Amino acid sequence: MAIKTKTSLIPSCSSPEDLKRVLQTLGSSWGDVVEDLERLEVVPLKGAMTNEVYQINWPTLNGEDVHRKVLVRIYGDGVDLFFNRGDEIKTFECMSHHGYGPKLLGRFSDGRLEEFIHARTLSADDLRVAETSDFIAAKLREFHKLDMPGPKNVLLWERLRTWLKEAKNLASPIEMDKYRLEGLENEINLLEERLTRDDQEIGFCHNDLQYGNVMIDEVTNAITIIDYEYSSFNPIAYDIANHFCEMAANYHSDTPHVLDYTLYPGEGERRRFISTYLGSTGNATSDKEVERLLKDAESYTLANHIFWGLWGIISGHVNKIEFDYMEYARQRFEQYWLRKPLLLEG
């Protein structure tokens, strides 16, 4: 079946009925979308913290036993403070063109329809399975090597400074003091000076490689990395650092905002991931290369804590998703100040 992508001026969605009408409108040319709204099932998907995500299921016109699924993504409030939606759409379409991730099926004013990938989204525990972690490491190396259009400049430091300005504009005087926002520009400057090197490898980074953005085909073990909203060119060590930090999170627990840093991977687990990452291309990898990237990734966790700490403050003011963004931010900044003496001054 040919799937057409089109842009629509459909108004915003605020209910399951709205989502069903979006599907009927954008899918009118597919030839298998039923007209009876009662036969369309809308299922909210948990774990998203930037957008609201739904799955729509329906029996197709080809028969009651033949079902289709699509994914509907409703853009979160205030996301334009974090990234340019037009650029994100271009990245999404480019990734689809390269055979990565889901296809874009249609757009409406505050969201889009995506192909539903028939694979299992990973759980927090999956990241700690050695074989699965190896698959992710190899896929991440492949991701970093993508030749994406546009400038290949590092975006990390510019983005941190932009987000800091937004956080300061939104924060109350009490929050300014609690999160030590006045001094963060100096911290960002220090990190950029200490972590930037001419010989560091720059790649197209996902920047949000938490378990919910990784899917696995349980037959072939093929890994699919999804959700490219924060993607940009950055030091690969930063992206690996982000992945390691995400091992402290479980966004499907009763307290999804709580981070458990006793779960942060030990040196042996991190070394294995990086060795697999570097060796996945088939080229010989030296111990020196592994140790250098291991050290760099650990140092870049500091930038990662500031990144997601600022994200938490901004989101706490603009996003209506049920998640304790401010407490999440507090934990990320706490880790920054705890780890900084060990990683920069030790």
Swiss-Prot record:
**Which InterPro entries does its entry note?**
Choline_kin_N, Kinase-like_dom_sf
- E.C. designation(s): 2.7.1.32
Q: Which domain of life is it from?
A: Eukaryota
Could you tell me what reaction this enzyme catalyses? choline + ATP = phosphocholine + ADP + H(+)
Q: Which Pfam families match?
A: Choline_kin_N, Choline_kinase
Which terms under GO biological process does the entry name? response to wounding
Tissues expressing the protein: Expressed in roots. Expressed at low levels in cauline leaves and flowers.
Signal peptide stretch: none
Keywords from the UniProt entry: ATP-binding, Kinase, Lipid biosynthesis, Lipid metabolism, Nucleotide-binding, Phospholipid biosynthesis, Phospholipid metabolism, Transferase
Which pathway does it take part in? Phospholipid metabolism; phosphatidylcholine biosynthesis; phosphocholine from choline: step 1/1
The induction text for this entry reads: By wounding, and salt and osmotic stresses.
Task: Recall the GO molecular function terms of this protein's record.
Answer: ATP binding; choline kinase activity
Which residues take part in binding ATP?
Answer: 73, 210, 227
Indicate whether tRNA processing appears among the record's keywords: no
This molecule's function is given as: Involved in phospholipid biosynthesis. Catalyzes the first step in phosphatidylcholine biosynthesis.
Which family does the record assign? Belongs to the choline/ethanolamine kinase family.
This chain belongs to the protein called: Probable choline kinase 1
